[in-house]
Amino acid sequence: MVNPYTPSQNIIWDPSSLSDARLKTNLTEVTSEQCLNTLRNIKPQTYDRGDLGNERRLGLIADEIEEALEKAGIEVDNVIGQRHWQVDGESDVYKTLQYERLVPLLIGAVNSLSARVQDLESAPKKKRNGAAASKPV
């Protein structure tokens, strides 16, 4: 496969976005709470990328994502990867992060927070209805 990353263009193209249920086996649900707990342990940061001319960037740290997924009990093989990269003339293996593969965590966390908001919004109504029903006539 041709390397989908072109450093000079900063473009990532992933030709393997197939998501048909017929291609998936051994499905395991990741709960909304697991998603929320994972995101709680991730800190967006700004940083300088020395290998790209000290360009100031916003992003995540692959090591933190890896640790947060493990802490939440989520086992995946396709979020954190590795790539040989050359920095200051020396080649080494560095961790990579597939940002788009974090989207399911965002969806799960939004579902969790949405359920909490609904519970909080319905709580005052329940109290008002309960208080009205308990007043003497």
List the predicted regions and their residue ranges.
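Intramolecular chaperone/auto-protease modules of tailspike-like proteins
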Residues: 17-137
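Trimeric beta-solenoid/beta-helix "fiber body" segments of extracellular/virion adhesins
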Residues: 1-19, 41
